[in-house]
């Protein structure tokens, strides 16, 4: 105080002498007032610290309302303690008014720029103007007092005041009560109350912070206060309430976010007209930082530096119109913080920029030289020459420009400053103009500048991958915006989490782009879609697609093909080699081939137009090859019928000529569908690729043709192949007769059966069918030559056949119709078999009882099959033999199969004898034995059978002697092969049948028995049936007769047994699928005449099948219904429910037969059926099922 007084005295004494005393007194009063104010501020600071300490300790929301009232007024007002102080929200952050004349006085909100200089801050320091009436235009006195008091209390308690208020308090442990329900309810209520109170406390604290920012007296005070909050970690705590649902808290957070971004808004609105000095200082700083070295090729002036940075004009207002000072400030931050990345990107773009300028200068010089040359040429040459020179020079200029454009595409660049300003606007639009809360804004103060650096590096990365020219600037910018927007909505909490999320997005994006490229390459086809239905590789002579109707098939008429057809020598096309060398031709044949090409003007195969090199260049060549192979194989397999072949050669191919009306005149035609249509060039290898046999050659074909035509009287010359036309020529004389054609057919059929395995069976069938067609079309001219190509093109000089889609379509349509008809025929056959099975079931049900009752008195044989009845009575002393091993054949498949038969050894022996008898009947033209199964003519057939026993013919005796000498399985005749194939689908087994002898016949007439091995594969047709009881009786009688005759023929039996043992293995192997009865060798029985009498053809008892086993046994399986006569069509048999019901094998011991032998021998003369004991079953086995 004393120093101040002395200074004032010195001032007074040094002042002007005219200074009056009143002025001195006034100055002294002002000094006194200032002293009083200082005293008052000290007292106010002490009282404010007391209040802040009270708020720090009590943590009540209403106390922040008191602090807000202290901040907005300079005087204290009494507060009623009984009235609660209401919440006072903070004012909305003020906007910035840009006015050039009053920019300093009317700018309202502070600007948050960390890189501004003191000079710029003093010139553009804003003055706060709040919406609240209490806030005046002058600096607030309480802002500094409250700030000092809060800092003092924080130092006193060693913890930040705001962090202490905003943190959630630790909940104190509740007292344990006896009632747990009341305890839980109290805990919930306390938690709810504490949450609500804490939200109010947070809202009050944030409102006080916003009020402090709004009442800052200067920009310096505003920025200082904001940086203190950030440095002390208050923003980290405030960021945790971004997800709060309390409306007051969210409102205050939004206001605090607005305060943080108001500085960014102010910088964006600062133009060169408002603050020219700051703008120029920032530009100079950017140029110095971007080009720190002045040596070498670095620019020296700011104009050159700004041009390299991407500034297009000198008008800074236009350049900075979109971003203002904010764009330059972001670029300075990027250069200062990440100089290495910044310098690398900038140098790369400058290098591309310089190269393009050099190329442009060279182009301008070349154009000048060309123009001078044009002028000289115009003076020296005529007008026509001048025009030609001008055209040539212009074309050279166009080529140079095109080359330069290609180089420009490779050396694409972008404007560095343009990208910086655009990305600044992009981030400003995403975050600043949005009204949502983002945690990244509360993370750090330079969040906006950090996002700018990340986005700039992202743009450069995408540009290096996808940017090829200046036109790609907009797509790359859109992709950058999409990535930033995607990350924005994930709401990352910090810049570090933003970078991690960006890395994940980029990895996903690059992997997807790579996958899409791979899919496009895999799905791409060579030349696009094909115009041909055959799936031929696309492309004509020019490589185009031929989309229009006129150009659709122009690829089949290219110049390359025409030159190939017109040439007389072997021509190696581009990218291919001629493998097949053609033989020399006469001039006549060459002229004829040229006339043919002039008439047709169409190749046989579109494969001629595409070379192997074109297919190899395609990314996926195997798809086209696979498609063509499948279609060609389909068309070749469907053309196997003779009618289709005739239509393809005559009707569908358009061969019309009046000279071919004579069937014996015409040319022999031979066409092979699987051989390539044209040989030479690339098509030599296409035959093996498209399914044709690679080992088949035309030399073999010529040898076959020579052998086929050897039987013709006038032999023609050997066929010759012409590689130019792809045709075979053959001379055939007109004197070929029908005999020669027939011999040729037989010889070629034998050749087709003995062809090499390399030739496909379809090719063999084609050769046989073509021989049938050649017999009807033989030529009358001896010297005429018919060119026969291995394709569908046939041209004899008068007519031509064009290969087109119509003929292919017709042939396929006919083949499909034939296949449909075959399917219908098969369906009819299956349907008829099903109907037969149904009828057999009905017949068995209706005729079962009648046949069982009338079996003893029935004199005629019923051909319908029957199951042995289970209620058949047997003698009391009869004991069936059950020593068979049923476990071997007792599986489920054997029980349920329809192929279970009477001792299959006996049944198959019947088959062989029936085939032999049918053969003998056909040779001697005797038809009386063919109708053995008709019930109306049984007596007549019995008489014929007896006559056949008495009078054997010499031919039959010879056959029997051969069978005795060679008791091996004999081959079937050729006539029975077809029958075997037709009946092979259904396995049939006959029942044992025997003939009824006449009552007046003597015992001496009983025929002898010859036992021979049978053929397992004989046909089973034409076997008669008998009812079950009659078959049992006849089996016993035959068994007795066989045992008597065997005693006199022991030597013959021993020899035959040895042969049977040798053939047992072969018989078992051939009948593995058929169940065979155990321990009974398979024999064939031929009943030979035992005395004199008329000789008959058949030596069977029933004039039918004459084969029975040496030791017959009864059936253990049901009788199948397949064995029916030609006149009757009995249905299929009924399936047995169990194998135990099928046990009908009965063995009669030799002792019992010897006891009854006298009875049987004495009664045969009177009646065969009387003397032979009747075997009857007592009871069938019950099923266990």
From Swiss-Prot:
Residues 94-127, 176-194, 361-406, 587-613, 688-699, 733-760, 767-780, 853-864, 912-974, 1053-1072, 1096-1109 have a biased composition (Low complexity). Pfam families: ELMO_CED12 (PF04727). Residues 275-488 form the ELMO domain. Residues 648-665, 721-732, 781-790 have a biased composition (Polar residues). Residues 829-841 have a biased composition (Basic residues). Residues 88-133, 176-196, 361-409, 566-628, 642-805, 819-868, 883-989, 1044-1114 are annotated as: Disordered. GO terms for molecular function: GTPase activator activity. This is ELMO domain-containing protein F.
């Amino acid at each position: 105080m004393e120093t101040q007084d002395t200074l004032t005295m010195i001032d007074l004494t040094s002042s002007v002498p005219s200074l009056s005393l009143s002025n001195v007194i006034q100055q002294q009063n002002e000094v006194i007032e200032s002293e009083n104010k200082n005293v008052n501020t000290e007292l106010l600071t002490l009282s404010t610290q007391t209040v802040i300490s009270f708020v720090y300790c009590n943590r009540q929301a209403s106390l922040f309302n008191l602090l807000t009232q202290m901040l907005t007024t300079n005087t204290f007002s009494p507060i009623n303690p009984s009235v609660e102080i209401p919440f006072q929200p903070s004012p909305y952050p003020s906007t910035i008014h840009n006015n050039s004349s009053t920019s300093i006085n009317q700018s309202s909100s502070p600007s948050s720029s960390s890189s501004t200089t003191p000079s710029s801050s003093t010139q553009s320091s804003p003055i706060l103007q709040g919406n609240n009436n209490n806030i005046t235009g002058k600096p607030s006195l309480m802002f500094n007092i409250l700030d000092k008091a809060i800092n003092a209390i924080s130092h006193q308690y060693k913890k930040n005041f705001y962090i202490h208020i905003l943190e959630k308090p630790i909940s104190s442990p509740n007292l344990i009560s006896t009632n747990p329900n009341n305890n839980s309810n109290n805990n919930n209520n306390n938690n709810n109350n504490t949450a609500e109170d804490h939200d109010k406390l947070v809202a009050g604290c944030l409102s006080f912070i916003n009020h402090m920012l709004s009442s800052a007296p200067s920009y310096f005070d505003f920025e200082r206060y904001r940086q203190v909050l950030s440095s002390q970690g208050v923003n980290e705590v405030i960021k945790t309430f971004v997800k709060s649902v309390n409306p007051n808290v969210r409102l205050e957070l939004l206001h605090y976010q607005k305060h943080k971004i108001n500085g960014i808004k102010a910088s964006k609105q600062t133009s060169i007209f408002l603050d020219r000095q700051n703008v120029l200082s920032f530009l100079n700083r950017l140029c110095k930082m971007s080009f720190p070295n002045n040596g070498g090729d670095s620019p020296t002036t700011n104009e050159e530096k700004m041009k390299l940075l991407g500034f297009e004009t000198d008008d800074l207002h236009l350049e900075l119109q979109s971003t203002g000072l904010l764009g330059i400030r972001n670029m300075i931050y990027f250069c200062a913080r990440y100089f290495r990345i910044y310098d690398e990107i900038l140098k790369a773009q400058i290098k591309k920029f310089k190269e393009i300028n050099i190329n442009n200068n060279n182009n301008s010089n070349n154009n000048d030289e060309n123009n001078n040359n044009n002028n000289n040429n115009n003076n020296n040459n005529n007008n026509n020459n001048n025009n030609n020179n001008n055209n040539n020079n212009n074309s050279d200029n166009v080529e140079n420009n095109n080359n330069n454009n290609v180089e420009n595409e490779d050396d694409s660049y972008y404007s560095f400053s343009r990208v910086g300003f655009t990305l600044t606007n992009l981030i400003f639009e995403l975050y600043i103009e949005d009204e949502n809360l983002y945690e990244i804004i509360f993370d750090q103060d330079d969040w906006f500048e950090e996002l700018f650096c990340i986005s700039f590096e992202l743009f450069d990365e995408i540009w290096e991958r996808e940017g090829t020219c200046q036109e790609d600037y907009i797509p790359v910018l859109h992709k950058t915006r999409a990535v930033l927007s995607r990350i924005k909505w994930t709401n990352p909490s910090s810049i570090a989490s933003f970078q991690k999320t960006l890395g994940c997005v980029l990895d996903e994006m690059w992997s997807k782009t790579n996958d899409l490229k791979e899919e496009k390459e895999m799905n791409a086809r060579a030349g696009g879609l094909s115009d041909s239905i055959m799936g031929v590789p696309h492309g004509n002579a020019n490589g185009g697609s031929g989309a229009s109707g006129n150009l659709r098939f122009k690829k089949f008429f290219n110049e390359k093909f025409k030159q190939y057809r017109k040439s007389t020598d072997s021509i190696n096309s581009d990218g291919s080699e001629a493998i097949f060398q053609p033989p020399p031709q006469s001039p006549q044949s060459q002229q004829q081939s040229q006339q043919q090409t002039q008439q047709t003007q169409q190749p046989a195969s579109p494969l001629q137009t595409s070379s192997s090199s074109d297919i190899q260049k395609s990314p996926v060549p195997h798809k086209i090859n696979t498609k063509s192979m499948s279609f060609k194989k389909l068309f070749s397999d469907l053309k196997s019928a003779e009618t289709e072949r005739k239509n393809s050669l005559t009707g569908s191919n358009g061969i019309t000529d009046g000279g071919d009306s004579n069937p014996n005149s015409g040319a022999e035609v031979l066409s092979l569908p699987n051989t390539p249509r044209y040989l030479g060039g690339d098509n030599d290898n296409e035959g093996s690729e498209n399914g044709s046999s690679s080992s088949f050659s035309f030399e073999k074909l010529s040898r076959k043709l020579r052998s086929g035509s050897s039987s013709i009287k006038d032999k023609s010359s050997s066929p010759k192949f012409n590689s130019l036309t792809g045709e075979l020529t053959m001379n055939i004389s007109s004197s070929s007769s029908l005999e020669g054609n027939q011999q040729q057919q037989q010889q070629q059929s034998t050749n087709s059966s003995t062809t090499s395995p390399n030739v496909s069976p379809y090719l063999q069938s084609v050769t046989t069918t073509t021989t049938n067609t050649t017999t009807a079309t033989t030529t009358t001219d001896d010297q005429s030559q018919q060119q026969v190509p291995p394709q569908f093109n046939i041209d004899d000089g008068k007519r031509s056949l064009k290969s087109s889609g119509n003929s292919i379509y017709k042939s396929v349509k006919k083949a499909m119709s034939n296949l449909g008809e075959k399917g219908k025929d098969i369906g009819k056959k299956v349907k008829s078999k099903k109907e037969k099975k149904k009828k057999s079931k009905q017949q068995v049900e209706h005729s079962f009882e009648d046949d069982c009752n009338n079996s003893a008195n029935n004199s005629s044989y019923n051909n319908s099959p029957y199951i042995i009845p289970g209620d058949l009575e047997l003698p009391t002393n009869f004991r069936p033999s059950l020593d068979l091993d049923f476990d071997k054949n007792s599986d489920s498949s054997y029980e349920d199969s329809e192929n279970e038969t009477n001792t299959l050894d006996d049944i198959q022996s019947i088959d062989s004898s029936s085939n032999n008898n049918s053969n003998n009947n056909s040779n001697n033209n005797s038809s009386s034995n063919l109708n053995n199964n008709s019930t109306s003519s049984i007596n007549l057939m019995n008489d014929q059978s007896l006559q056949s026993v008495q009078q054997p013919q010499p031919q039959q005796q010879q056959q029997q002697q051969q069978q005795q000498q060679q008791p091996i399985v004999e081959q079937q005749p050729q006539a029975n092969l077809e029958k075997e194939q037709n009946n092979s689908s259904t396995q049939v087994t006959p029942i044992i049948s025997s003939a009824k002898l006449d009552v007046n016949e003597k015992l001496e007439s009983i025929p002898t028995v010859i036992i021979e091995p049978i053929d397992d594969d004989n046909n089973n047709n034409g076997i008669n049936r008998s009812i079950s009881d009659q078959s049992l009786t006849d089996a016993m009688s035959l068994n007795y007769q066989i045992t008597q005759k065997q005693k006199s023929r022991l030597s013959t039996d021993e020899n035959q047994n040895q042969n049977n043992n040798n053939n047992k293995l072969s018989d078992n192997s051939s009948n593995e699928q058929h169940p065979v009865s155990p321990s009974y060798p398979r024999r064939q029985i031929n009943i030979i005449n035992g005395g004199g009498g008329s000789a008959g053809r058949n030596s069977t008892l029933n004039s039918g099948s004459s084969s029975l086993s040496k030791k017959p046994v009864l059936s253990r399986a049901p009788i199948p219904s397949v064995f029916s006569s030609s006149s009757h069509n009995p249905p299929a048999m009924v399936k047995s429910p169990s194998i135990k019901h099928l046990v009908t094998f009965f063995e009669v011991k030799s002792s019992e037969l010897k006891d009854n032998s006298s009875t049987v021998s004495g009664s045969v003369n009177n009646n065969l059926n009387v003397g032979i004991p009747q075997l009857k079953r007592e009871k069938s086995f019950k099923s266990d099922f």
